[in-house]
Amino acid sequence: MVPATGQLALLALGILLAVCQALENSTSPLSDSPVAAAVVSHFNKCPDSHTQYCFHGTCRFLVQEEKPACVCHSGYVGVRCEHADLLAVVAASQKKQAITALVVVSIVALAVLIITCVLIHCCQLRKHCEWCRALVCRHEKPSALLKGRTACCHSETVV
């Protein structure tokens, strides 16, 4: 059986990719050795004369420009961190509201689940639970009482 043209093309492509990858991963030494870059900080501490330069941030002194700059705290913007970022404040407030709502909904759902489990357990063991019997007996049809049958509650019998 002779392979189809498409299969031959895929086979050739696979061989070509394998050869290229083998050449790419060669272990021959590099011709030029890497040169370590000098580590120089672009920032220094601000001088004492600029300790109060930033209103809501940390002062840094730019080495190349020889002037102070500010790294603003979250929620503040501006050259000297003098403006409140209203979008950040609103986003933080919305996040707190969402977390509060989630906690409240979780507590309510847990309370409903616990009450449901207690009611199911109580109704399965009706004879041991007075308040469950009172709930069931309140909804019992009066016709059952009038025919001389015993009611679900032991305290209610018709003479």
Swiss-Prot record:
Domain (EGF-like): residue spans on this chain: 44-83
Q: Which residues cross the membrane?
A: 98-123
What is the disulfide pattern of this chain? 46-59, 54-70, 72-81
Q: Which PROSITE patterns match?
A: EGF_1 (PS00022), EGF_2 (PS01186), EGF_3 (PS50026)
Signal peptide residue numbers: 1-23
Task: Kindly provide the name given to this protein in its UniProt entry.
Answer: Protransforming growth factor alpha
Quick one: where's the S-palmitoyl cysteine lipidation? 152-153
- Organism for this UniProt entry: Mus musculus (Mouse)
What Gene3D superfamilies does its record include? Laminin
One GO cellular-component annotation of the UniProt record comes to: perinuclear region of cytoplasm
What spans does the record annotate as topological domain Extracellular, numbered to this chain?
24-97
GO MF terms here are:
epidermal growth factor receptor binding; growth factor activity; receptor ligand activity; transmembrane receptor protein tyrosine kinase activator activity
